[in-house]
Amino acid sequence: MIGIIDYGRGNLRSVEKALWKLGYPAKVLESPAELMAVKGIILPGVGAFADAMAALEEKGWIQPLIHYAHSGKPFLGICLGMQVLFEVGEEHGEHKGLGLLPGRVVRFPAGRKIPHMGWNTLHQEKPCRLLEGIPDEAYFYFVHSYYVASEEQEILAGMSDYGVPFPALVGRDNVWGAQFHPEKSSPWGLKLLENFGKWVNEDATVSSHRS
């Protein structure tokens, strides 16, 4: 079972529907107490960085999410859910993120239409399990006004460009993030979600053999 975190800042049902369509059971989690029952989680999100972190704190999600990330189970952030994985966001002032990945979330430079909305290509920087079966320069759907700035090359799996190059798929170990919306990016976005579902199932199988 894949859990989708409900903190009032995401299009939860479209992600849930996409996973079920692919054959991967999913449920929306309304309380941190439900985390232990799922084998992988997705943190969606739309809106502002500060509002998202405030909502996560208000609903008691921050420490449980950090603990879950450290458990080694698959963790995927989507759009704003990817951005809050990082250390600091600069939207409406400077705000602390979850700190699971190194980097800052900054605004696109002046001169570009904001938000960056629509289809854009993903240039694959390195192989990773989420990109298996997806061609280089495949199109994905984006909606965002801020982007991640990180000097840690090891976490950059895919890049896009909107006046400046920006990370579109990031991660290391079990914590990953997609700046685009895979649930709106058929067919390749659904392939990425399928790859995540396979990873969750494989990880759960390995864990059960260890126990």
Swiss-Prot record:
Pathway: Amino-acid biosynthesis; L-histidine biosynthesis; L-histidine from 5-phospho-alpha-D-ribose 1-diphosphate: step 5/9. Its EC number is 4.3.2.10, 3.5.1.2. The active site is at C79, H181, E183. Residues 1-206 form the Glutamine amidotransferase type-1 domain. One of its GO terms (biological process) is L-histidine biosynthetic process. SUPFAM superfamilies: Class I glutamine amidotransferase-like. It catalyses: 5-[(5-phospho-1-deoxy-D-ribulos-1-ylimino)methylamino]-1-(5-phospho-beta-D-ribosyl)imidazole-4-carboxamide + L-glutamine = D-erythro-1-(imidazol-4-yl)glycerol 3-phosphate + 5-amino-1-(5-phospho-beta-D-ribosyl)imidazole-4-carboxamide + L-glutamate + H(+); L-glutamine + H2O = L-glutamate + NH4(+). GO terms for molecular function: glutaminase activity; imidazoleglycerol-phosphate synthase activity; lyase activity. Its main location: cytoplasm. Keywords: Amino-acid biosynthesis, Cytoplasm, Glutamine amidotransferase, Histidine biosynthesis, Hydrolase, Lyase. GO terms for cellular component: cytoplasm. It is found in: Cytoplasm. InterPro entries: Class_I_gatase-like, GATASE, Imidazole-glycPsynth_HisH. The keyword Lyase applies. IGPS catalyzes the conversion of PRFAR and glutamine to IGP, AICAR and glutamate. The HisH subunit catalyzes the hydrolysis of glutamine to glutamate and ammonia as part of the synthesis of IGP and AICAR. The resulting ammonia molecule is channeled to the active site of HisF. Heterodimer of HisH and HisF. HAMAP family: HisH (MF_00278). This is Imidazole glycerol phosphate synthase subunit HisH.
